Amino acid sequence: MTVIIASHWGPQSKQMLPPEPPRIILREVPVQNNQKEHPPVQEIKTVSSKSKEHRVSSSRKIPDHFDVGPRFYMNVPADGSEVFEDDEKDVENECWAVIERIGSEDDKFEASELVEYRDHDWYIALAINKEKTPDKANYQHLLYSYRGGIQRIILTPQQTDSIDKTPLVKYKIIGDGLYEVLPIHSSLPQTGLISPKYRYNKGVELRIFGIVNWIDFVLDDDHQTHRTMVWTDAVGPIYLSAADRANIRRKLLLTEMQIFAPLRMCHITVKAEFNFSIPDGSPIQWTISSFQPLIEESEKDPNIGRNLWPARVLRFDDLVVTKKTPNGYWLKSQRLEGHVNVFAGANQIGIIESAGEKYATKGSMMAFVVPCYQNSTFAYFEALIAGPPRVVMIITEGRFLNYCPKTWPPSVRKMRDQYQKEHVLKSEVRSSPICMKQPDYCLKSLRGFSECPF
């Protein structure tokens, strides 16, 4: 339907007559395209005869005394269906409801990571090799996971194509010889986070990023007896003895406090021997051949934690001590009671007791934890560092502030970028000196166009 609102001002004369009320003309708009018929569209057009030429305006407002009967919408189908502007807000509210139900903003990780890394039915595995089965119909994949060790599973060509582009996958046993397998896109080869190399029936070499746990090299007299754990998402924990730390220290010519600072990221190359005689379920002994700590150029360097922080490292802020043993402390979560049990080893005793005996037994603790498995089943979380929140923040030099999820919702991302632009970057902007604006000035003297004598 076409709605034409016309008004007549009378003949052109010196005497101005009062305007007549506009007339509404309704007529059908013919369909222009014969290939595909669309429902008729109702349009609003206003015709004014102030001049000799009639001008059609689609944005003119209809007077209030014509706001009767059904309303007419621009470019709205005649069947009455409407598109609401707040659909995006509804979807966003639903997403936040899911996040609030599964986790909270304080957890500093997104809901997808909660589902992926807290559902312990999944195996997070490194894809080492694949080869066709004797019947040439399926593929046999050689996988290694911290939870299940070496596994040889048979997948269909469709499943093989879905995980063929990433070296890190997750799979779940759904039946006798049946598996559900999914890729982990954050470990794509172009990201550089995981670079595997397989020597057929000889060994595996892997370049990967890891994170170091806490050992007090100054105040702890027993630090030589503690093992340093380097956590990696692909192959789990790699333990270093005091002799291994000393060898790395001699190669890098740095102190152990600089190399193995608490929660310091590192880039390592690990190797392991492998042959076909190793049965399924056997663990692999990894050895570190190259160790490079990522020492921040400035305090709280935001790029390290945002891009390279292992996704399976979780943070809890509501832990309380339940039991003390000669080997360490056991803690549990107040909010997720019965689901989160954390073990802090002997290297964490000093930091947990740093705030006094009363706080050590009744106070809330902060901990960065990684999963620990026994007999291919999840047993508990092991703490990289645990203690009073303020002490943990001081010891880690604020590195936990770098731990932010890989993706925020668009609204939060927009607010963060706007704050960064207005309050952080704006105060750091300084006008460049003249020698930086025009580099040839450094070759000129103030008295004329002459080069420097040297």
Curated annotation (Swiss-Prot):
Cite a single GO BP annotation: regulatory ncRNA-mediated gene silencing
Q: Main localisation, per the record? A: cytoplasm
- Compositionally biased intervals (Basic and acidic residues): 50-61
Enumerate the subcellular locations listed in this protein's record, separating them with semicolons. Answer: Cytoplasm, Perinuclear region; Cytoplasmic granule
Q: What is the effect of changing G210E?
A: In gg662; disrupts inheritance of small RNA-induced gene silencing
Tissue expression profile of the protein? Expressed throughout the mitotic and meiotic regions of the germline and in oocytes.
- Give the keywords, sorted: Cytoplasm, RNA-mediated gene silencing
Residue ranges of the region described as Disordered: 31-61
Please indicate which superkingdom the organism of origin belongs to. Answer: Eukaryota
Gene Ontology cellular component terms for the protein in this record:
perinuclear region of cytoplasm
Describe, as the record does, how this protein assembles with itself and its partners.
May interact with pid-4, pid-5, app-1 and prmt-5.
- Role played: Involved in gene silencing mediated by a class of 21 nucleotide PIWI-interacting RNAs (piRNAs) that possess a uracil residue at the 5'-end (also called 21U-RNAs) and that guide the Piwi protein prg-1 to its DNA targets for silencing. Not required for the biogenesis of 21U-RNAs. May also be involved in gene silencing mediated by 22G-siRNAs (a class of 22 nucleotide endogenous small interfering RNAs (siRNAs) that possess a triphosphorylated guanine residue at the 5'-end) and 26G-siRNAs (a class of 26 nucleotide siRNAs that possess a guanine residue at the 5'-end).
- Under which name does UniProt file this protein? Protein pid-2
